[in-house]
């Protein structure tokens, strides 16, 4: 049962993230069509074709929401049926199943009924907006607000406002980018740009107002921000929200110049909007992860203090000497179990059972083992950052820096989970049942993938423009993964102190990925600046890793 | 070119599929009778688990593991006035027990936990 619930939690966050992305794109697309593109389409050159493109995107988003919500609800229903032993008809009456079913039905209606004809009729258009509103209402029923003991009504309205803000702004950006790609008329760009700016401002206002209220009710005080997993995740969301605001401000200046009939860097606006989509979706996955942790205000014990953070991060020389594998807690436990079994003349049980839900034992040597891993990873990443900078400055041989990623991947594969093959007794395949081991292996796969792609691109083996984008995309996705990665450490405080180091690493990863994206996609000064930003982010990641402590 | 694009899409799909993890507790156990690692006398006992959020009582579960490792599913009393509680009763004999609980919060999040406690001989 423990494995099933852990796997359920793992998959449900992923699916929930996909649901938020699809829901925001569907609602954002619908609002973009009803309040921007449809009223302007007769004024724009090829307005009908543009409308058709955004209609298609919105319908696909609705289909995506249909599938993601269906999978998420089915997973939840299955987990509940198999762990509590209730029949399907009973589980389908649970509030999450009802709201999931409502969202599935709404998505299906929009996917099937949204077209140029319905968009042109005021009654049909209003009905579609109403279906969108129902989606939003159903979505708020699966937020923290619905299960709160107090202030339910207020918190439900606030949660709805937050999701509406995210939909109209971040969810609308893919439609905006699509229009920017196909619209080349200056006056048309000015009209679309300035109207989308106003819609975005409304979205930002909704997010800001609801965000402040949620911070008051769910976090409560300053210690809630730095002393709990919920607060740390919200802080990361706020940091990314600020980055979006900076990019949005850049785009606002472009639309203002266009509105005044002056020359404006439209391509920059498009590229910035692409990055906004990436960071916005990262925020959605962070939000999905946030729904699985209890609000900070409910955690009155096991909070981390500033003093504990300062003690943990006191400067110390990196650890470049590894403890012996036999000194680790799991090895010592296995020796003890073997000895006891031999005494009783029976087969010795394994010291750890993958997927049992029990955190593995830890001692001081385990901590030293983990710090050694992080510090050597830091050396690799600092070298990568330095060589990338040298390559940027014109040193030819430094272009082979992505090969260091392969060394890093090999190092992590061997050392990340000492209880697993090749160092430990645990079978390679059986270890996939352990959620943390699975995450580590997927990280390794990601590192290998972006190392190979970037090296192939830099050495001319891959000449496709799209192949060059794999590295930034995977680095950004890796940052998003790290943002929501958690460690199975029994002590809640220790776990949070580890997360506190990983959060800036994740944010630097997201920043590195998207600045490299800009370097590739944005010609001129902006791209050149971005070309120095991402190696600097790698240097920062390396230095944070060298600073890393677990005790 | 086409193969490369397919590979990119596949890589991204894999990456997106693992882009998020978070198996932490959602419903927080605020208080309980018996207390975790606490002791109580043998006999007919009220079991009360109090959470930070509203719980779907009909779709949650309490399993009592007795000292001989036998498992009993406890019937949960539905009580609309105490929406954040899982209440039940059990007849306990001296020994070490564990209460496995699984709570479905009203917003759809499943959380599980263990509550170990000791039953002493009745005075």
Each language-model region and where it sits:
Chain A
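Polytopic transmembrane helical bundles with strong interfacial aromatic enrichment
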Residues: 1-368, 390-401, 451, 455-460, ...
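Helix-loop junctions on the outward
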Residues: 71-88, 414-435
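Structural signature of hydrophobic alpha-helical transmembrane segments
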Residues: 96-105, 372-379, 439-445, 500-507
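Alpha-helical transmembrane segments and their helix-helix packing motifs
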Residues: 112, 407-420, 432, 460-461, ...
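Alpha-helical membrane segments in multi-pass integral membrane proteins
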Residues: 165-166, 170, 466-487, 497-518, ...
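Membrane-helix interface and helix-disruption motif detector
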Residues: 225-227, 367-371, 393-398, 423-442, ...
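Short, flexible domain-boundary/linker segments around small modular repeats
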Residues: 353-368, 381, 404-411, 419-434, ...
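Short, solvent-exposed interaction modules
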Residues: 427-456, 504-514, 518
């Amino acid at each position: 049962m423990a494995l099933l619930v852990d796997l359920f939690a793992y998959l449900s966050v992923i699916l929930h993230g996909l649901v938020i992305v699809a829901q925001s794109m569907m609602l954002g697309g619908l609002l973009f069509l009803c309040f921007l593109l449809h009223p302007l389409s007769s004024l724009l050159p090829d307005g009908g074709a543009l409308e058709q493109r955004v209609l298609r995107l919105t319908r696909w988003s609705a289909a995506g929401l249909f599938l993601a919500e269906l999978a998420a609800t089915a997973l939840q229903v299955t987990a509940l049926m198999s762990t509590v032993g209730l029949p399907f008809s009973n589980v389908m009456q649970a509030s999450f199943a009802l709201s999931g079913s409502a969202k599935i039905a709404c998505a299906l209606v929009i996917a099937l009924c949204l077209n140029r004809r319905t968009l042109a009729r005021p009654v049909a258009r209003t009905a579609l907006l109403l279906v969108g509103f129902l989606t939003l209402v159903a979505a708020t029923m699966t937020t923290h607000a619905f299960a709160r003991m107090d202030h339910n009504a207020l918190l439900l309205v606030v949660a709805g406002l937050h999701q509406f803000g995210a939909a109209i702004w971040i969810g609308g950006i893919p439609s905006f980018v699509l229009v920017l790609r196909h619209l080349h008329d200056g006056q048309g760009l000015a009209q679309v740009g300035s109207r989308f700016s106003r819609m975005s401002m409304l979205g930002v206002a909704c997010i800001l107002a609801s965000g402040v209220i949620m911070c008051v009710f769910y976090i409560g005080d300053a210690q809630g921000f730095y002393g709990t997993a919920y607060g740390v995740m919200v802080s990361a969301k706020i940091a990314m929200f600020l980055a979006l605001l900076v990019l949005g401000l850049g785009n606002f200046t472009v639309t203002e110049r266009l509105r005044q009939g002056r020359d404006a860097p439209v391509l920059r606006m498009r590229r910035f909007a692409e990055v906004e989509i990436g960071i916005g979706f990262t925020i959605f996955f962070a939000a999905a992860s946030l729904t699985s942790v209890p609000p900070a205000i409910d955690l009155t014990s096991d909070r981390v203090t500033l003093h504990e953070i300062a003690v943990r991060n006191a400067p110390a020389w990196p650890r470049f000497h590894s403890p012996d594998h036999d000194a680790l807690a799991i090895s010592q436990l296995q020796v003890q179990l073997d000895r006891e079994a031999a005494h009783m003349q029976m087969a010795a049980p394994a010291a750890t059972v993958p997927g049992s839900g029990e955190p593995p034992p830890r001692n001081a040597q385990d901590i030293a083992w983990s710090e050694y891993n992080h510090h050597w990873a830091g050396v690799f990443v600092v070298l990568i950052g330095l060589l990338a900078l040298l390559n940027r400055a014109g040193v030819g041989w430094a272009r082979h820096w992505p090969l260091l990623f392969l060394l890093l991947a090999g190092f992590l594969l061997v050392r990340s989970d000492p209880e697993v093959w090749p160092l430990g007794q645990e079978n390679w395949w059986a270890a996939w049942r352990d959620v943390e081991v699975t995450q580590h292996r997927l990280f390794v796969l990601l590192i290998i993938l972006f190392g190979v792609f970037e090296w192939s691109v830099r050495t001319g083996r891959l000449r496709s423009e799209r192949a060059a984008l794999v590295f930034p995309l995977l680095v950004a996705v890796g940052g998003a993964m790290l943002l929501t990665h958690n460690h199975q450490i029994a002590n809640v405080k220790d776990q949070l102190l580890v997360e506190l180091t990983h959060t800036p690493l994740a944010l630097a990863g997201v920043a590195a990925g998207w600045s490299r994206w800009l370097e590739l996609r944005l010609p001129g000064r902006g791209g050149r600046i971005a070309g120095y930003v991402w190696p600097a982010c790698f240097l920062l990641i390396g230095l944070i890793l060298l600073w890393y402590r677990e005790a | 070119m086409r193969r490369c694009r397919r590979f990119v899409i596949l890589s991204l799909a894999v990456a997106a599929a693992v882009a998020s993890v978070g198996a932490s507790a959602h419903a927080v156990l605020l208080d309980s009778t018996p207390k975790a690692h606490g002791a109580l006398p043998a006999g007919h006992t009220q079991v009360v688990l109090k959470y930070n959020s509203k719980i779907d009582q009909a779709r949650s579960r309490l399993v009592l593991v007795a000292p001989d490792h036998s498992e009993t599913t406890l019937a949960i009393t539905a009580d609309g006035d105490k929406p954040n509680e899982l209440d039940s009763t059990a007849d306990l004999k001296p020994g070490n027990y564990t209460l496995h609980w699984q709570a479905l919060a009203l917003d759809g999040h499943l959380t599980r936990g263990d509550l170990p406690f000791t039953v002493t001989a009745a005075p």
